[in-house]
Amino acid sequence: MLFSKLFAPTLKEPPKDAVLKSHKHLAQAGYIYQVGSGIYNFLPLAKKVLDKIENITHKRMQEHGAQNILMSFVVLASLWEKSGRLDKYGKELLVFKDRKDNDFVLSPTLEENITEIAANFIKSYKQLPVHLYQIHTKFRDEIRPRFGLVRAREFIMKDGYSFHEDAESLDKEFLNTQSAYKEILSDLGLDFRIVEADSGAIGGSKSREFVVLTECGEDTIVVCQNCDYAANIEIAKRSKRPEPLNVPKAQLAKFPTPNTTSAQSVAEFFKTEPYFVLKALVRKVIHKDKETLACFFVRGDDNLEEVKALNALNIIGANALELREASQKDLDNVGLIAGFIGPYGLKKHVSYIIFDEDLKEGDCLIAGANEKDFHAVGVDLKGFENLVYADIVQVKESDRCPNCQGALKYHKSLEVGHIFKLGQGYAKSLKASFLDKNGKEQFFEMGCYGIGISRLLSAILEQKSDDLGCVWTKNTAPFDVVIVVSNWKDEAQKKLAFEVYERLLQKGVDALLDDRDARFGAKMRDFELIGERLALIIGKQTLESKEFECIKRANLEKQTIKDIELEEKILEMLESE
């Protein structure tokens, strides 16, 4: 490719609204062009990188037995009604009508679509297992699209679905796909982790995320420093903590506690640790057709994990869609006073009460007395009947690993893949069944597997690039080598550049010849910005010495290469990175 023919509209400055370096570099280097909020055009350089990512993905998925298909981007809303997700998914699901007044959705995920395919064409256990996948455009109407391709509304996704006759078969495919994903991300040259995760709106019994470690990541993962335990902070667990020594032993009594509304101030008032204070957190619960209130109790030195809290509610049948902060008006309406909420008589004020599992059989506790400026001491939870306990706290870095007692540490990360065990939920709601070996009708066990193809462009750059521009990995750079001529008006330099260009092409090197009549500094700036893996410099000294200067984009390290060794050395350098 000649640079003069390459459509790469570079910018002098990155967009003003770009925050992450990946967004800045992709826009400034002419990879992407924004056409609307969270919607981007992929220009030739980006398309080359996308193609490489997709080719690696196709290769590994098919090696692991998956078959490539292409499903409709537009899906009947009636399918989403059958699965129950039309209302549950929320406003991120874009619903529209055609000219005949039929309702459709632009797919953010395709569980309904693929399940309908299976229901129509897989009739016998003899056809199982089946794993089908696609790479296609998706749309999620994000309320706040940001960070370029990291949180876009329109994006490219590899999503796959598997169908099985039993849970054992699903377990095998879950691990098989996990292996495929590990190979894909390793081929892409990424430093990543596999972590336990929440299943979210997709549902299912078990899920794992594949996250790329980067300080600019949206997510926080909790990693053990001693073993391989790793989990998204939304579901991370910890070992039971040892109880502090100064236990505030007391008979049940009510004490005046003026202006002590925080767990810390209550602990200081009673000269004890926040560990022994019951912290009450009231949330407004949003259901499909109503709103209720829930109260969650944790120890005073813990914080509520909202995802865990929502899941705990749904386990007890709340059918909650989301949680929101309860306003002062919400509390006033039910007669609760912030800072003084406790378990005594609370059932008449809220619809749901859940205690963190660390409080099970807890005694010697201090809690709000449900009366302004009063707290109760000597609270013993064993005296209450039918309390609901669940893991609802957010793990802290001071906590210990649930597997080995090792220290837990936070890491910022960016999710690039997610695999789920869906079970029979979608199959039952969409009546997708088959006949087993005994001729009995059974519902499919399903798996779901996704990789954010377009998001991977940002993930690679967030982990690998520098302040100058794009740094790609071995298998993702748009070009292997750019040939930069110091003085394009020098016919001898120009002639040598074309000769070298042809020599590299013959060796299978994806080379870009910068044939522009531009300043040498400007050409090198574009090399740093675009991120070809190597820059081969041709100047007056090259003609005299028969030696080339070669620069690695990854670290800007320079190396001198003799003309007679050119192809051999270039291939070695490309293979080594």
Swiss-Prot record:
Compartments (UniProt record): Cytoplasm
EC number: 6.1.1.15
Biological processes, Gene Ontology terms: prolyl-tRNA aminoacylation
One cellular-component annotation, GO: cytosol
Positions of disulphide bridges: none
Pfam families: HGTP_anticodon (PF03129), tRNA-synt_2b (PF00587), tRNA_edit (PF04073)
InterPro entries, alphabetized: aa-tRNA-synt_IIb, aa-tRNA-synth_II, aa-tRNA-synth_II/BPL/LPL, Anticodon-bd, Anticodon-bd_dom_sf, Pro-tRNA-ligase_IIa, Pro-tRNA-synth_IIa_bac-type, Pro-tRNA-Synthase_IIa_type1
Source domain of life: Bacteria
Catalytic reactions on record: tRNA(Pro) + L-proline + ATP = L-prolyl-tRNA(Pro) + AMP + diphosphate
GO MF, one example: ATP binding
Enzyme class: ligase
Repeat listed as a keyword: no
Keyword vocabulary terms for this entry: Aminoacyl-tRNA synthetase, ATP-binding, Cytoplasm, Ligase, Nucleotide-binding, Protein biosynthesis
Assembly behavior: Homodimer.
Family (UniProt): Belongs to the class-II aminoacyl-tRNA synthetase family. ProS type 1 subfamily.
UniProt domain comment: Consists of three domains: the N-terminal catalytic domain, the editing domain and the C-terminal anticodon-binding domain.
Function: Catalyzes the attachment of proline to tRNA(Pro) in a two-step reaction: proline is first activated by ATP to form Pro-AMP and then transferred to the acceptor end of tRNA(Pro). As ProRS can inadvertently accommodate and process non-cognate amino acids such as alanine and cysteine, to avoid such errors it has two additional distinct editing activities against alanine. One activity is designated as 'pretransfer' editing and involves the tRNA(Pro)-independent hydrolysis of activated Ala-AMP.
Protein name in UniProt: Proline--tRNA ligase
Gene: proS
